[in-house]
């Protein structure tokens, strides 16, 4: 669902900016290319989303609460 993917992308972006982390720093630290996900060039898996949440010390449950708000 493209709408859900867009919400996930926007929520990741908000969390990343809240923590003051650049795309480059995030990629260097995790190897996850958020720009590709954000541009819709690749889909996001649950395991990738889990890695993103772990990086920001956020549970998947809390991430989805942010997604709904």
How should each PLM-predicted stretch be described?
Residues 1-19:
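A short, Lys/Arg-rich alpha-helix, primarily the initiator
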Residues 12, 23, 46-49:
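Helix-turn-helix DNA-binding elements, focusing on the entry/boundary residues of the two helices
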Residues 19-36:
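Short alpha-helical DNA-recognition segment
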Residues 35-38, 64:
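Key DNA-contacting residues within the recognition helix of helix-turn-helix
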Residues 41-54, 60:
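Short, basic-rich loop-to-helix N-cap that marks the start of a DNA-contacting helix
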Residues 57-69:
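Short C-terminal boundary/hinge segments that cap the last helix of small helical domains
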């Amino acid at each position: 669902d493209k709408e859900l993917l867009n919400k996930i992308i926007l929520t990741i972006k908000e969390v990343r900016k809240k923590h003051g982390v650049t795309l480059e720093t995030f990629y260097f630290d995790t190897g996850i290319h958020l720009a590709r996900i954000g541009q819709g060039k690749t889909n996001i898996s649950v395991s990738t989303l889990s890695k993103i949440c772990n990086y920001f010390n956020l549970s998947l449950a809390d991430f989805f609460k942010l997604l709904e708000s």
